[in-house]
């Protein structure tokens, strides 16, 4: 039995790509720039009492806004401006800022802080409110991300994703690491380290767990890792191969791809490892399941038509309704991912000898390539649906890249120092 038959299409590609290259002290630095031709000018003053902090909150806020590609940071000078100060909004508008942020960090002892800020619209000459956040030495970065999220939503009308997290796999020498980081690639933590490959990380809807496939027992087994406690447990160790975990929207069930009876088929299993149930009933390879946001459908890859294409079936399985083909642009399509609003389908299409990220409008069926890279894999939507994170190759290296989901700007390579990184998954909004 071939490796493709054993693991399905994506597991084959992932296990090959993740084995190529190595990383030494790799760190992901996320950069998403040039997203729009019009950027919102904003000035964020230094917060009062920031001196001596292990993390400068205003630096994090400015970096987040700039990285989104939606904002231009106007120089606010070096003088701290607390949220209680009287602000001349007209003067800031004259400096080119359409919004202004002021704030303070109050030291409460024992490494505890209270962060207050206020956001102003300098055009309408009015306050847009603010937040009061509690933080400690280790959560100052999170507080900065939350402030940037507030600004993003108030000024653009879309919820920000700066406080979300990423997961990805880095290979360092002969060791694989599943890492969890902030959305900017900083503050990375190692969730699992192994001498065997790790693939297919998938975030739970709550953002507290990650399911993944580990080869540490010399075969692919699906695990769930509880991030707050560090505890992990097997979810699927069936006969043959276990791969491609995908969470249901309620977090109670995972769809998995198993070769339990020969060719890889899709099953569902409870998140505690019980209740195994077969969902597809074909003699072909069915793999890479992904739930629609409303939980009604499972999208998956199958070669039942002769070559890999994306199909959709009821979440209860083919016994509840026949699977229907979804992709018709291109002869080889894999790795389905549905946007959080259920309107878009991201997938990988083989075109011109390479593999490119496509996005399809699920209502009209219109599909377009949105990248200029040629070895794309593992697409993952941001929680607000505005960006897609994916793995590709650039300059002979395995890298991550991010691109607007509407294709309005070229993809930006995420800088990884000295190494190979793959298998990205963008986490949900934190609850």
Curated annotation (Swiss-Prot):
Q: What is this protein called?
A: Tol-Pal system protein TolB
Signal peptide as annotated in the record: 1-26
Coarse class of the primary localization is: periplasm
Gene Ontology terms: biological process: cell division; protein import
Residue span of region Disordered: 411-431
Which cellular compartments is it found in? Periplasm
Gene from which the chain derives: tolB
Q: Which domain of life is it from?
A: Bacteria
> Which keywords are on file for this protein?
Cell cycle, Cell division, Periplasm, Signal
Q: Which GO terms describe its cellular component?
A: periplasmic space
Q: Which family does it belong to?
A: Belongs to the TolB family.
Against InterPro entries, the record matches this protein to: 6-blade_b-propeller_TolB-like, PD40, Tol-Pal_TolB, TolB_N
SUPFAM superfamilies in alphabetical order: TolB, N-terminal domain, Tricorn protease N-terminal domain
